[in-house]
């Protein structure tokens, strides 16, 4: 028995258990990837991730559930937060995005006026045409976004509750989300050409037409 006491104890390795740790790591990695791909949605409004997704009807969220709200006097403020996650922006919080270049857009309010800035950096919506002051540049960095005005300042809200572009740097108060209600293209799960999908007979027909 003395010989047995000198034997170094070790964990019993059973068949099929050896790669358990690796499998758990794979599952964790897949779960993290899935979380990254998960859409940030409020109602049917999803948060854009790049400039190419900005088009059509959009809303600009300044704080959780609180959107830029157009007033009938041509000014803008931050609307009351929508507490329900399924509640999207109201009509005064919806704008039409018009691409002007590979990095700039114009934004048109529901009152038919383009958003711009005055000489003091106050965001106003009183223009019937797009000029230099009605151009905006969404800036993306490490998963966050800010909106740069033509005066090279970022959009935020001042103490009076007015929307302004007066900050040369983008802090937490200048972080935004642009939400779109456009229908998203379904993500492809494979690289199989469309003509290769379907049964054999259908594939033959597809290639005949090709």
Curated annotation (Swiss-Prot):
Keywords associated with the record: Actin-binding, Cytoplasm, mRNA processing, mRNA splicing, Myogenesis, Nucleus, Ribosome biogenesis, RNA-binding, rRNA processing
InterPro entries: Actin-crosslinking, FRG1
Region (Disordered) residue spans: 1-37
UniProt record, GO biological process: mRNA processing; muscle organ development; RNA splicing; rRNA processing
Compartments it resides in: Nucleus, Cajal body; Nucleus, Nucleolus; Cytoplasm; Cytoplasm, Myofibril, Sarcomere, Z line
Predominant cellular place of this UniProt entry's protein: nucleus
Any matching Pfam family: FRG1
Stretches with biased composition (Basic residues): 17-30
Motif Nuclear localization signal location, chain numbering: 22-30
GO MF, one example: RNA binding
GO cellular component: Cajal body; catalytic step 2 spliceosome; nucleolus; striated muscle dense body; Z disc
Tagged with keyword RNA-binding: yes
Signal peptide: none
Quaternary state and interactors: Homodimer and homotetramer in solution.
Family of the protein in this entry: Belongs to the FRG1 family.
PANTHER family noted in UniProt: FRG1 PROTEIN, FSHD REGION GENE 1
Function: Binds to mRNA in a sequence-independent manner. May play a role in regulation of pre-mRNA splicing or in the assembly of rRNA into ribosomal subunits. May be involved in mRNA transport. May be involved in epigenetic regulation of muscle differentiation through regulation of activity of the histone-lysine N-methyltransferase KMT5B.
Identification of the protein by name: Protein FRG1
Organism expressing this protein natively: Xenopus laevis
Chain's gene name: frg1
